[in-house]
């Protein structure tokens, strides 16, 4: 069903030992978010906010809803179907958007709508990324209340300290500690299953929740109020989208096997165990997860839950770095400083700007909401909307790329859409109670991304409009050629057909040309990694002038000097970094009320442009080989 063979790690038939290592690694990274959902899902479903009683039919109804949500949304949609919609092995909403746009006519209304959906979905991811660390860590630390109620005043301070440590150590990378994430998370899931079995033996009738009749009966008894309970049920599937987003790191097979044969059974056992406890001891509703733990294992379980929450937070934070890098490469957010934290693993990066923004917002959330129950009210809306967008994009992929399978995938997409629309409606009812926060954050990020994208387009238009075409400029220049100096000049340009401002300034003030001159355009392809045969394209335009295109995938960190060094000799240009000067224009944006965007967006774009990391640093151009020349552009 996949449109192309996927080169993602683990997608082939790896040796058994290697495959098992990938499965354990995936358990440590991919399933962290969904693995901490038992900490708060049933606790939220039976909170006073929803007014449910703990009678037999209601408990079985809620358990049945959670079971079928996991089976339909996570197992069927994400693990079985959508993970086949890979973009050269990569997953996630940005990769899915780029894949979908490749099936549509460039510049068409459909491509525009898909772009809007993808950007909004990525924006909502950051809302989810703020809440997940807060609710996971706080839900784990709240276990202390069960062990020692007198510790209640210390729950928030302890949560803040744990989160501060998590964010402060990001700059050191996770290469070393990441090796223990898998075993710790495996122990966490085994503990979930063991706790579940411990309680199920006391009330085995909870196994009847596998029958969908109990979910249907729940809606029949509770009517529209039953729909709103889905606002709590959706917490059981939060993190399901991470299985697809992290596919490029581990491959589809290890993630599928980890889910089918280990993670899903352990989660189901734990939810059923909590339900069994509630049937026998309704007072356990205050915190059914920790009440289900035997007293002798309570403190070890609190420690293990906190470690699992930290690992889940780590997965979301690194996921935010990855999405931010993809968005930068695809031109949706300003360039930011990216640091590599591993010499061996290219995907391990640290983005300081994203890290500190997340830290401030996560800690602010903890201080404002002060409990996992209050945070659960805010949770879910962004996840539900992201899942809904994934379904719409999946339908487009199935229609265009899967002719053999579309007749059964498209009807399933209708089922997914109805379920996820119900999740969105249920969470929308909590807007005033706190669900507004991730939605508002998503809208802010969406506005920033759209403003940056549109502003860059307007900037290119202005430069092109005021510029001189190279094909008409060079013949005139060669009629009275300026003096030539030894070496090579590389002029970075967004439009290689127009004379760069930096060249015009150099001629005006220095009145010289280098022996060899390159007009360099750096482009990002809508695929994760640029193939070697598309990495570099060289065109000779006469008199030792060359037009060079360097291309990268959206998962790559651009290194222009390295790309030139590896490829230029093949195109007949000798590239010596020590004999090359890079020239770049640094535009100053002047906002105008009479141009393409409202004045407030012009000013916002100017602010973002002013604070963006210079293209030269982003492209790894050495500062001692760089000349930057300013230019003022009105948009």
UniProtKB/Swiss-Prot annotation:
Keyword presence, Cell inner membrane: yes
Spans traversing the lipid bilayer: 20-40, 62-82, 111-131, 149-169, 180-200, 223-243, 259-279, 292-312, 349-369, 377-397, 408-428, 429-449
Pfam families: K_trans, K_trans_C
Membrane topology recorded in Swiss-Prot or TrEMBL: Multi-pass membrane protein
Keywords: Cell inner membrane, Cell membrane, Ion transport, Membrane, Potassium, Potassium transport, Symport, Transmembrane, Transmembrane helix, Transport
GO molecular function (one): potassium ion transmembrane transporter activity
An annotated GO BP: potassium ion transport
Function: Transport of potassium into the cell. Likely operates as a K(+):H(+) symporter.
Protein name: Probable potassium transport system protein Kup
């Amino acid at each position: 069903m996949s449109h192309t063979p996927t080169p993602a790690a683990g997608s082939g038939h790896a040796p058994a030992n290697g495959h098992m290592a990938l499965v354990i690694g995936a358990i440590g990274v991919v399933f962290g978010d969904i693995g901490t959902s038992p900490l708060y899902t049933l606790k939220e479903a039976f909170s006073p906010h929803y007014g449910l009683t703990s009678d037999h039919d209601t408990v079985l109804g809620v358990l049945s809803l959670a079971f079928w949500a996991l089976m339909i949304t996570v197992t069927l949609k994400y693990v079985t179907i959508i993970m086949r919609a890979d973009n050269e092995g990569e997953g996630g909403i940005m990769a899915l958007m780029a894949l979908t746009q490749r099936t549509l006519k460039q510049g068409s209304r459909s491509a525009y709508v898909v772009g809007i959906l993808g950007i909004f979905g990525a924006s909502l991811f950051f809302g989810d990324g703020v809440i997940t660390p807060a609710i996971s860590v706080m839900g784990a630390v709240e276990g202390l209340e069960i062990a020692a109620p007198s510790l209640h005043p210390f729950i928030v301070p302890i949560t803040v300290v744990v989160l501060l440590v998590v964010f402060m150590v990001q700059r050191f990378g996770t290469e070393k500690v990441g090796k223990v994430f898998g075993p710790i998370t495996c122990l966490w899931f085994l503990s979930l299953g063991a706790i579940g079995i411990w309680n199920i033996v006391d009330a085995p009738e909870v196994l009847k929740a596998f029958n969908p009749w109990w979910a249907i009966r729940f809606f029949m008894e509770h009517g529209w109020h039953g729909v709103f309970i889905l606002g709590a049920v959706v917490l059981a599937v939060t993190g399901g989208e991470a299985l697809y987003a992290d596919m490029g790191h581990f491959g589809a097979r290890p993630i599928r096997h980890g889910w089918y044969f280990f993670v899903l059974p352990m989660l189901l056992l734990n939810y059923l165990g909590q339900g069994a406890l509630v049937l026998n001891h309704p007072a356990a509703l205050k915190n059914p997860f920790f009440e289900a733990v035997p007293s002798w294992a309570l403190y070890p379980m609190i420690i293990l839950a906190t470690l699992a929450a930290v690992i889940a937070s780590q997965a979301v934070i690194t996921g935010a770095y990855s999405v931010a890098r993809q968005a930068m490469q695809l031109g949706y957010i300003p360039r930011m400083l990216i640091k590599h934290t591993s010499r061996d693993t290219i995907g391990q990066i640290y983005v300081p700007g994203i890290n500190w923004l997340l830290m401030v917002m996560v800690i602010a959330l903890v201080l404002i909401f002060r409990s996992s129950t209050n945070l659960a009210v805010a949770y879910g809306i962004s996840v539900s909307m992201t899942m809904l967008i994934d379904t719409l994009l999946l339908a487009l992929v199935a229609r265009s790329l899967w002719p053999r399978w579309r007749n059964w995938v498209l009807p399933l997409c209708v089922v997914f859409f109805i379920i996820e629309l119900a999740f969105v409606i249920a969470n929308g009812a909590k807007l005033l109670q706190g669900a507004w926060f991730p939605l508002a954050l998503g809208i802010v990020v969406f506005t920033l991304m759209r403003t940056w994208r549109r502003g860059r387009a307007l900037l290119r238009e202005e430069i092109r409009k005021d510029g001189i075409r190279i094909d008409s400029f060079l013949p005139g220049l060669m009629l009275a050629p300026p003096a030539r100096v030894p070496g090579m000049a590389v002029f970075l340009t967004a439009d290689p057909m127009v004379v760069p401002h930096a060249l015009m300034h150099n001629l005006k003030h220095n009145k010289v040309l280098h022996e060899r001159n390159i007009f360099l355009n750096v482009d990002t392809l809508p695929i994760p990694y640029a193939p070697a045969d598309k990495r570099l394209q060289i065109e000779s335009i006469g008199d030792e002038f060359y037009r060079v295109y360097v291309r990268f995938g959206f998962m790559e960190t651009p290194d222009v000097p390295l790309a030139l060094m590896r490829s230029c000799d093949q195109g007949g240009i000798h590239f010596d970094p020590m004999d090359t000067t890079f020239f770049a224009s640094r535009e100053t944006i002047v906002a105008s009320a009479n141009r393409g965007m409202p004045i407030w967006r012009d000013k916002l774009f100017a602010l973002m442009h002013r604070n963006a990391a210079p293209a030269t640093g982003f492209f790894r151009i050495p500062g001692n080989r760089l000349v930057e020349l300013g230019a003022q552009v009105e948009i």
